[in-house]
Structures are given as C-alpha cells and as structure tokens.
C-alpha cells in the first residue's frame, strides 16, 4: 500500500444513505481476486446506462449524465462524501478495492458498516466518521471546486474557510496507513524476530523439520 500523506482534494458528494456493497461493485465482478482493475466498474449500475460485465471496455459505454461521478467538475477527486451506513450489505472486499482503484483515499460519512470500515484500512482508504450535522454542512458546501484537506497525522479535516474537524482513529490502524502497511507488510516488520524464532525452534525441536 502507499503511505497515507496529508492531501487536499476536490470532494465528490454522494448524497445517498445506506449505499451497500452491491451498489459499490455489483456481484458479477466478484469472480476476480486481482485487487486491481475494478475502478472502471465502481458504482457500475448508477454510473452507466447499460449492464457491465467483467473485463468489459468501459471507455465507450453510455454514461448516466445525472450521476455525480460522471460530472466533469468532480474528475480526479480523491475524497468521497457519503451519508450514513455507507458500505452496508455483504462483506465483499472488492468494494474498497474498487474505491481505491478509482482513486479515492478518504471517505467521509456519519457511519459505516463495520466490515466495510475494517476493510478500508486494509486497502489504503481512510474512512472518516464525522457527526451527521457536520456531514450535512459539508454537503451544503460541496459544490464544484469545493476542496477539503485530510491530515491523518493530526486526525483532522479542514475546509477552505479555516474550519477544522477532528476525527478518531485507532492508533494501530493509523500507524498502518501512515506507513503503507497491509497485513503482509505489518508481519514483515517483525521479520528478524520471526527468523530468530524459527532458528531457535529448529534447534529445540529438530524432528519437526525432518524431511522424510
């Protein structure tokens, strides 16, 4: 994973509550476990006017002109602003894969489904919980050109008007995002200790390593 740095970005306002993982990435795309290449199919049923299929070339598909992700003013945005219970439904990890592959690094919402929330941290996305009144205010301001600054180190979201909102994040998850560590990377931080344990184990219980 890429280390999570402080950044400023335009904000995509997805003004829908209870967005489930099937809306984020429909079930027909779950056959692949490549972890990459899902960005073009993010919000597929809302984003396009036809039905998407795995490995389909999306460059010529008819776009839904009313869907917020298709509006040119939000192109390149890395922050998604959402409503409560974002990521509900099935536990598919493809949902954060698609969001990350599209380019989102942070999602702001009043609440998230638990499994989706956990999966975001494992895939380089920062899910930020702000109270509903604050999210309402951000939606009222999130027109074309509106930007926010996300600073994980200080655990703050800042507006262009000088307002700053603090968010909570578990210390271990913060460490992982700041250092770009997935589960494998976190384990490799203890590589020397693991090798030392294996070497000691071979001496104390050599029969476990005997080759027939």
UniProtKB/Swiss-Prot annotation:
Pathway the protein takes part in: Amino-acid biosynthesis; L-leucine biosynthesis; L-leucine from 3-methyl-2-oxobutanoate: step 2/4
GO biological process: L-leucine biosynthetic process
Catalytic activity: (2R,3S)-3-isopropylmalate = (2S)-2-isopropylmalate
Alphabetic keyword roster: Amino-acid biosynthesis, Branched-chain amino acid biosynthesis, Leucine biosynthesis, Lyase
A single GO molecular function term of this UniProt record: 3-isopropylmalate dehydratase activity
Superkingdom of source: Bacteria
Pfam families, alphabetized: Aconitase_C (PF00694)
Gene Ontology CC entries for this record: 3-isopropylmalate dehydratase complex
Keyword RNA-binding appears in the UniProt entry: no
Leading EC class: lyase
EC number: 4.2.1.33
SUPFAM superfamilies noted in UniProt: LeuD/IlvD-like
InterPro entries with a match to the protein in the record: 3-IsopropMal_deHydase_ssu (IPR004431), Aconitase/3IPM_dehydase_swvl (IPR015928), AconitaseA/IPMdHydase_ssu_swvl (IPR000573), IPMI_Swivel (IPR033940), LeuD (IPR050075)
Family as reported in the entry's similarity comment: Belongs to the LeuD family. LeuD type 1 subfamily.
HAMAP family: LeuD_type1
Subunit structure: Heterodimer of LeuC and LeuD.
Function: Catalyzes the isomerization between 2-isopropylmalate and 3-isopropylmalate, via the formation of 2-isopropylmaleate.
Protein name per UniProt: 3-isopropylmalate dehydratase small subunit
Organism: Methylococcus capsulatus (strain ATCC 33009 / NCIMB 11132 / Bath)
